[in-house]
Amino acid sequence: MSDILNTILARKADEIAERSARVPLAELVARSADLPLTRGFAAAMKASIAAGEPAVIAEVKKASPSKGVIRPDFHPADIAVSYEFGGASCLSVLTDMYFFQGSDAYLQQAREACTLPVLRKDFTVDPYQVYEARVLGADCILLIVSALEDQQLADLSGLAMQLGLDVLVEVHDIDELERAVQVPVPLVGINNRNLRTFEVSLQTTLDMRAAVPRDRVLVTESGIVTASDVQLMRSNGVNAFLVGETFMRAPEPGEALRQLFFAHD
């Protein structure tokens, strides 16, 4: 596990303790019991791929630990509308406050402004956060394999699916991928960013794609910047993408999405 991830997880443990003191787990469990159905995150991804189109998870992200503030003029609802118009299949919204300047409110604002399913992009390590995601209105959660033991991975993914949430498991190397595919989740994300060096290489996805079972949707994450990057992936059978920073630096995120993925079809 990288030093930055250790730091984030230590902070996350404190945050969970603070939140559960304010809103007890039992209250979240009760509130999660009578909610509308989710929008179907994995189904939306699969529908785009079945139609022969790229399935794009477009990210709503203000800042990151490595880059600082990426988008100072940050309005999640407007970004969500722009992404939907640009052809996104789903959204990803950062909710981590301390390291990414995210917010639960950003997820709710983005989701209310559009009809797309939404991933809560956070560091989920505790059942409390799974119930919290469902109550917030998320349609999918992220589980980062390098942050979890095998039993945690199984328990958290099982709870999420029991609550009607889809799960995207994120891996960085082949050892993590072998662990990830042991849990029956629909979406496997390969992050092309090395957590130790922060260097990005699309070869990471290409080297690992054959080890992803055919019944899972393989999502390539980080480093998709040009139309040739998209074409490289699609020509190798990778049709699902999570893209954030490239769009967040553009004046019109949805137009940047359309230009990257759909202007060359």
Curated annotation (Swiss-Prot):
The keyword Lyase applies. Pathway: Amino-acid biosynthesis; L-tryptophan biosynthesis; L-tryptophan from chorismate: step 4/5. InterPro entries: Aldolase_TIM, Indole-3-glycerol_P_synth, Indole-3-glycerol_P_synth_dom, Indole-3-GlycerolPSynthase_CS, RibuloseP-bd_barrel. SUPFAM superfamilies: Ribulose-phoshate binding barrel. One of its GO terms (molecular function) is phosphoribosylanthranilate isomerase activity. It is an enzyme of class 4 (lyase). It catalyses: 1-(2-carboxyphenylamino)-1-deoxy-D-ribulose 5-phosphate + H(+) = (1S,2R)-1-C-(indol-3-yl)glycerol 3-phosphate + CO2 + H2O. Its EC number is 4.1.1.48. GO terms for biological process: L-tryptophan biosynthetic process. Keywords: Amino-acid biosynthesis, Aromatic amino acid biosynthesis, Decarboxylase, Lyase, Tryptophan biosynthesis. CDD domains: IGPS. The keyword Transmembrane helix does not apply. Belongs to the TrpC family. HAMAP family: IGPS_B. This is Indole-3-glycerol phosphate synthase. The lineage of its organism: Bacteria, Pseudomonadati, Pseudomonadota, Gammaproteobacteria, Lysobacterales. The gene is trpC.
